[in-house]
Swiss-Prot record:
Gene this protein is translated from: recR
GO biological process terms held by the UniProt record: DNA recombination; DNA repair
Organism listed in the record: Desulfosudis oleivorans (strain DSM 6200 / JCM 39069 / Hxd3)
UniProt protein name: Recombination protein RecR
Location of the Toprim domain: 81-176
InterPro entries according to UniProt: DNA_Rcmb_RecR (IPR000093), Rcmb_RecR (IPR023627), Rcmb_RecR_Znf (IPR015967), TOPRIM_dom (IPR006171), TOPRIM_RecR (IPR034137)
Length: 199
């Protein structure tokens, strides 16, 4: 069997580096791209370049945005006194799909994981404390995953936030033990947000 030409091998190699894309799927994608109109391939390439060029972190909550302040932080109808702390931007999107939360977010960009060398200075805990010090936030909802690292991060945040006059709550049942926020269905997340509890 003849090997693929270099241009196809190169495309397969790059596609297979994406999460969840193995060699076979990368081959199928490369073959598909060879058969779609040139315009579609150029639009895909342009969208990928734009993704890298235009996506940044919101200067307030650190979720993904294409503007300095994201649409959620810039929305005057959101309750700025209610702050939901999540691990990453995908959790923001998952909670937003429920339409059950009307507050604002703080994205940590990770969880505490000593085994992986990730400590408090490696995620956006300092920025969270800075937001709380401003006195606008009255309730903090900890919506980290229920895996060991997420629970440890939530417990650490409870201690860090004790000196401040804020109510700290945790998303409630509905999230399975060891479950991840980003993979939960909207109904489960809605129930978890509505049944949060004080810590």
């Amino acid at each position: 069997m003849l090997p693929y030409p270099p241009s196809i091998r190169n495309a397969i190699s790059h596609l297979s580096r994406l999460p969840g894309i193995g060699q076979k799927t990368a081959e199928r994608l490369a073959m598909h791209l060879l058969h779609v109109p040139d315009r579609a391939v150029h639009e895909l390439a342009r969208s990928l370049v734009d993704l890298k060029k235009n996506t940044r972190m919101c200067s307030v909550c650190f979720t993904l945005s294409d503007t300095p302040v994201c649409a959620i932080c810039g929305d005057p109808d959101r309750n700025a006194s209610l702050l939901c702390v999540v691990e990453g931007p995908t959790e923001v999107m998952a909670i937003e799909k429920t339409a059950a939360f009307k507050g604002v977010y703080h994205v940590l960009h990770g969880v505490l994981s000593p085994m992986d060398g990730i400590g408090p200075d490696d995620i956006r805990i300092r920025e969270l404390v800075d937001r709380v010090k401003k006195g606008i936030v009255k309730e903090i909802v900890l919506a980290t995953d229920t895996r060991v690292e997420g629970e440890a991060t939530a417990a650490y945040l409870v201690e860090v936030l004790k000196p401040f006059p804020v109510t700290v709550t945790r998303i409630a049942s509905g999230m399975p033990a060891g479950g991840e926020v980003r993979y939960s269905d909207p109904v489960t997340l809605k129930n978890a947000m509505e049944k949060r509890y004080a810590l």
